[in-house]
Protein backbone atom coordinates (compact mmCIF):
# COMPACT_ATOMS: atom_id res chain seq x y z
CA UNK A 1 0.00 0.00 0.00
CA UNK A 2 1.41 3.41 -0.98
CA UNK A 3 1.78 5.80 1.99
CA UNK A 4 1.20 9.53 2.05
CA UNK A 5 4.97 9.87 2.40
CA UNK A 6 5.45 8.23 -1.01
CA UNK A 7 2.65 9.48 -3.27
CA UNK A 8 2.08 7.87 -6.66
CA UNK A 9 3.76 9.33 -9.73
CA UNK A 10 0.97 10.63 -11.98
CA UNK A 11 2.92 13.54 -13.52
CA UNK A 12 2.45 12.32 -17.10
CA UNK A 13 -0.90 10.55 -16.73
CA UNK A 14 -2.97 13.28 -18.44
CA UNK A 15 -2.33 14.59 -21.97
CA UNK A 16 0.12 17.53 -22.02
CA UNK A 17 -0.22 20.01 -24.90
CA UNK A 18 3.39 21.20 -24.84
CA UNK A 19 5.84 18.84 -23.15
CA UNK A 20 8.79 20.74 -21.71
CA UNK A 21 12.14 19.34 -20.66
CA UNK A 22 12.15 17.15 -17.56
CA UNK A 23 13.35 18.96 -14.42
CA UNK A 24 13.90 17.79 -10.86
CA UNK A 25 11.46 20.30 -9.38
CA UNK A 26 9.13 20.10 -6.37
CA UNK A 27 6.54 18.06 -8.29
CA UNK A 28 9.15 15.44 -9.22
CA UNK A 29 10.74 15.45 -5.76
CA UNK A 30 7.36 14.72 -4.17
CA UNK A 31 6.79 11.53 -6.20
CA UNK A 32 10.43 10.59 -6.79
CA UNK A 33 10.55 7.43 -4.61
CA UNK A 34 7.59 5.96 -6.50
CA UNK A 35 8.86 7.20 -9.87
CA UNK A 36 12.35 5.73 -9.52
CA UNK A 37 11.15 2.34 -8.22
CA UNK A 38 8.64 1.95 -11.05
CA UNK A 39 10.97 3.31 -13.76
CA UNK A 40 14.48 1.96 -13.07
CA UNK A 41 14.88 -1.83 -13.14
CA UNK A 42 16.98 -3.07 -10.23
CA UNK A 43 17.08 0.27 -8.42
CA UNK A 44 16.59 -1.24 -4.94
CA UNK A 45 19.34 -3.81 -5.59
CA UNK A 46 21.74 -1.08 -6.67
CA UNK A 47 21.00 1.04 -3.60
CA UNK A 48 21.52 -1.93 -1.26
CA UNK A 49 24.77 -2.92 -2.96
CA UNK A 50 26.13 0.64 -2.85
CA UNK A 51 26.02 0.32 0.92
CA UNK A 52 27.88 -2.99 0.79
CA UNK A 53 30.52 -1.60 -1.57
CA UNK A 54 30.98 1.44 0.68
CA UNK A 55 31.48 -0.82 3.70
CA UNK A 56 34.21 -2.68 1.83
CA UNK A 57 36.07 0.35 0.46
CA UNK A 58 35.61 3.16 2.98
CA UNK A 59 38.73 4.13 4.93
CA UNK A 60 38.92 5.76 8.38
CA UNK A 61 39.04 9.57 8.38
CA UNK A 62 38.06 9.83 4.71
CA UNK A 63 35.26 11.48 2.78
CA UNK A 64 32.43 9.80 0.92
CA UNK A 65 30.71 11.73 -1.86
CA UNK A 66 27.18 11.18 -3.19
CA UNK A 67 27.07 13.41 -6.27
CA UNK A 68 23.54 13.96 -7.49
CA UNK A 69 22.12 12.58 -4.25
CA UNK A 70 18.41 13.33 -4.99
CA UNK A 71 16.53 12.23 -1.85
CA UNK A 72 19.55 10.53 -0.29
CA UNK A 73 18.83 6.84 -0.88
CA UNK A 74 22.48 5.99 -1.64
CA UNK A 75 23.68 8.16 1.25
CA UNK A 76 21.35 6.38 3.67
CA UNK A 77 22.49 2.98 2.39
CA UNK A 78 26.16 3.90 2.82
CA UNK A 79 25.63 5.46 6.23
CA UNK A 80 24.00 2.26 7.49
CA UNK A 81 27.06 0.25 6.44
CA UNK A 82 29.93 2.55 7.46
CA UNK A 83 31.70 1.34 10.60
CA UNK A 84 34.95 3.27 10.21
CA UNK A 85 35.82 6.23 12.43
CA UNK A 86 36.14 9.84 11.35
CA UNK A 87 34.23 9.54 8.08
CA UNK A 88 31.98 12.18 6.56
CA UNK A 89 29.45 11.85 3.74
CA UNK A 90 29.02 14.84 1.44
CA UNK A 91 25.72 14.65 -0.46
CA UNK A 92 25.27 17.13 -3.32
CA UNK A 93 22.36 17.99 -5.59
CA UNK A 94 21.51 21.08 -7.64
CA UNK A 95 17.76 20.76 -7.02
CA UNK A 96 16.57 22.80 -4.03
CA UNK A 97 13.45 20.62 -3.77
CA UNK A 98 15.54 17.43 -3.64
CA UNK A 99 18.00 18.88 -1.10
CA UNK A 100 15.25 19.94 1.33
CA UNK A 101 13.55 16.55 1.19
CA UNK A 102 16.91 14.78 1.41
CA UNK A 103 17.65 16.59 4.69
CA UNK A 104 14.28 15.48 6.09
CA UNK A 105 14.93 11.85 5.12
CA UNK A 106 18.41 11.86 6.66
CA UNK A 107 17.24 13.51 9.88
CA UNK A 108 14.75 10.69 10.39
CA UNK A 109 17.61 8.22 11.04
CA UNK A 110 20.29 8.51 13.69
CA UNK A 111 23.89 7.75 12.72
CA UNK A 112 27.43 8.28 13.98
CA UNK A 113 28.54 9.23 10.45
CA UNK A 114 27.82 12.91 9.77
CA UNK A 115 26.31 13.96 6.45
CA UNK A 116 26.67 17.39 4.88
CA UNK A 117 23.93 18.04 2.32
CA UNK A 118 24.86 20.74 -0.18
CA UNK A 119 22.75 22.43 -2.85
CA UNK A 120 25.25 22.96 -5.67
CA UNK A 121 26.31 21.95 -9.15
CA UNK A 122 28.40 18.80 -8.73
CA UNK A 123 30.91 20.22 -11.22
CA UNK A 124 31.74 22.94 -8.69
CA UNK A 125 32.41 20.61 -5.74
CA UNK A 126 36.00 19.97 -4.62
CA UNK A 127 36.75 16.25 -4.29
CA UNK A 128 39.42 15.49 -1.71
CA UNK A 129 40.52 12.62 0.54
CA UNK A 130 37.75 10.46 -0.93
CA UNK A 131 37.56 6.72 -0.39
CA UNK A 132 34.14 6.36 -2.06
CA UNK A 133 32.42 8.49 -4.72
CA UNK A 134 28.92 7.70 -5.99
CA UNK A 135 27.33 8.95 -9.22
CA UNK A 136 23.97 7.19 -9.10
CA UNK A 137 22.11 7.96 -12.36
CA UNK A 138 23.66 11.43 -12.42
CA UNK A 139 26.39 11.58 -15.08
CA UNK A 140 23.85 10.99 -17.87
CA UNK A 141 22.23 14.37 -17.06
CA UNK A 142 25.48 16.33 -17.46
CA UNK A 143 26.41 17.87 -20.78
CA UNK A 144 28.51 15.21 -22.59
CA UNK A 145 31.44 17.61 -22.92
CA UNK A 146 31.56 18.04 -19.12
CA UNK A 147 31.64 14.36 -18.17
CA UNK A 148 35.34 13.59 -18.60
CA UNK A 149 36.39 16.69 -16.64
CA UNK A 150 34.18 15.67 -13.70
CA UNK A 151 35.52 12.11 -13.74
CA UNK A 152 39.06 13.49 -13.94
CA UNK A 153 38.43 15.58 -10.83
CA UNK A 154 36.95 12.57 -9.04
CA UNK A 155 39.95 10.42 -9.94
CA UNK A 156 42.35 13.08 -8.64
CA UNK A 157 40.41 13.36 -5.37
CA UNK A 158 40.18 9.61 -4.73
CA UNK A 159 42.68 8.00 -2.40
CA UNK A 160 44.64 5.03 -3.81
CA UNK A 161 42.35 2.01 -3.51
CA UNK A 162 39.28 4.25 -3.53
CA UNK A 163 36.19 3.39 -5.55
CA UNK A 164 33.88 5.25 -7.92
CA UNK A 165 30.40 3.73 -8.24
CA UNK A 166 28.67 4.85 -11.44
CA UNK A 167 25.06 3.87 -12.17
CA UNK A 168 23.64 4.82 -15.57
CA UNK A 169 21.23 4.04 -18.34
CA UNK A 170 23.21 2.55 -21.24
CA UNK A 171 22.99 2.72 -25.02
CA UNK A 172 24.20 -0.12 -27.24
CA UNK A 173 25.89 -0.10 -30.65
CA UNK A 174 24.02 -3.24 -31.76
CA UNK A 175 20.77 -1.63 -32.91
CA UNK A 176 18.66 -4.78 -32.57
CA UNK A 177 19.89 -5.35 -29.01
CA UNK A 178 19.45 -1.66 -28.19
CA UNK A 179 15.82 -1.65 -29.35
CA UNK A 180 15.04 -4.93 -27.57
CA UNK A 181 16.38 -3.59 -24.27
CA UNK A 182 14.34 -0.39 -24.69
CA UNK A 183 11.22 -2.50 -25.35
CA UNK A 184 11.92 -4.63 -22.26
CA UNK A 185 12.32 -1.48 -20.18
CA UNK A 186 8.95 -0.23 -21.43
CA UNK A 187 7.44 -3.64 -20.58
CA UNK A 188 8.87 -3.20 -17.08
CA UNK A 189 7.17 0.19 -16.76
CA UNK A 190 3.87 -1.21 -18.06
CA UNK A 191 4.08 -4.02 -15.52
CA UNK A 192 4.51 -1.35 -12.84
CA UNK A 193 1.30 0.42 -13.83
CA UNK A 194 2.46 3.11 -16.26
CA UNK A 195 0.16 3.72 -19.24
CA UNK A 196 1.26 4.11 -22.86
CA UNK A 197 0.56 7.86 -22.55
CA UNK A 198 2.75 8.16 -19.45
CA UNK A 199 5.61 6.23 -21.04
CA UNK A 200 5.45 8.28 -24.25
CA UNK A 201 5.18 11.70 -22.56
CA UNK A 202 7.93 10.96 -20.02
CA UNK A 203 10.21 9.83 -22.84
CA UNK A 204 9.54 13.06 -24.76
CA UNK A 205 10.27 15.15 -21.66
CA UNK A 206 13.51 13.41 -20.75
CA UNK A 207 15.13 12.66 -24.13
CA UNK A 208 16.74 16.11 -24.42
CA UNK A 209 18.12 16.22 -20.87
CA UNK A 210 19.29 12.62 -20.36
CA UNK A 211 21.89 11.48 -22.91
CA UNK A 212 23.26 8.07 -21.93
CA UNK A 213 26.62 6.65 -22.96
CA UNK A 214 27.60 3.11 -23.93
CA UNK A 215 29.39 0.79 -21.54
CA UNK A 216 32.38 0.96 -23.89
CA UNK A 217 32.49 4.76 -23.59
CA UNK A 218 32.50 4.55 -19.80
CA UNK A 219 35.27 1.93 -19.84
CA UNK A 220 37.37 3.98 -22.26
CA UNK A 221 37.13 6.97 -19.92
CA UNK A 222 38.11 4.87 -16.90
CA UNK A 223 41.10 3.44 -18.76
CA UNK A 224 42.26 6.85 -19.96
CA UNK A 225 42.00 8.28 -16.45
CA UNK A 226 44.13 5.47 -15.04
CA UNK A 227 41.71 3.43 -12.93
CA UNK A 228 43.34 0.08 -12.14
CA UNK A 229 40.15 -2.00 -12.33
CA UNK A 230 36.66 -1.34 -13.67
CA UNK A 231 33.66 -3.43 -14.65
CA UNK A 232 29.87 -3.64 -14.78
CA UNK A 233 28.75 -5.24 -11.51
CA UNK A 234 24.99 -4.99 -12.10
CA UNK A 235 22.78 -4.77 -15.17
CA UNK A 236 19.06 -5.14 -15.81
CA UNK A 237 17.97 -4.39 -19.38
CA UNK A 238 19.55 -1.05 -20.37
CA UNK A 239 20.23 0.10 -16.80
CA UNK A 240 23.21 -0.83 -14.72
CA UNK A 241 26.03 0.09 -12.40
CA UNK A 242 29.81 0.00 -12.72
CA UNK A 243 32.73 0.28 -10.35
CA UNK A 244 36.13 1.83 -11.01
CA UNK A 245 38.95 1.37 -8.50
CA UNK A 246 41.94 3.71 -8.31
From Swiss-Prot:
Binding site for S-adenosyl-L-methionine: 43, 68-70, 93-94, 121-122, 136, 203
GO molecular function: carboxyl- or carbamoyltransferase activity; S-adenosyl-L-methionine binding
Enzyme Commission number: 2.1.3.-
Coiled-coil boundaries: none
SUPFAM superfamilies: S-adenosyl-L-methionine-dependent methyltransferases (SSF53335)
Cysteines joined through disulfide linkages: none
GO biological process, one term: tRNA wobble uridine modification
Catalytic reaction list: prephenate + S-adenosyl-L-methionine = carboxy-S-adenosyl-L-methionine + 3-phenylpyruvate + H2O
EC supergroup of this enzyme: transferase
Keywords tagged on the record: S-adenosyl-L-methionine, Transferase
Role of this protein: Catalyzes the conversion of S-adenosyl-L-methionine (SAM) to carboxy-S-adenosyl-L-methionine (Cx-SAM).
Record's subunit section: Homodimer.
Record-stated family: Belongs to the class I-like SAM-binding methyltransferase superfamily. Cx-SAM synthase family.
Record-given protein name: Carboxy-S-adenosyl-L-methionine synthase
Naturally occurring in which organism (per UniProt): Vibrio cholerae serotype O1 (strain ATCC 39315 / El Tor Inaba N16961)
Biological classification of the source: Bacteria, Pseudomonadati, Pseudomonadota, Gammaproteobacteria, Vibrionales
Amino acid sequence: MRSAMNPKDTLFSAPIDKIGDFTFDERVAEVFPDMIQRSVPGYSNIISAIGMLAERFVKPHSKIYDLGCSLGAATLSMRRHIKQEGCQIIAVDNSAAMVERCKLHLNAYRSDTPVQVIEADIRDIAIENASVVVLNFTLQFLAPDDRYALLEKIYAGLRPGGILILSEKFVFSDQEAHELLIDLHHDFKRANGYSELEISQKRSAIENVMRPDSIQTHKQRFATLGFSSFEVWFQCFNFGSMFAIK
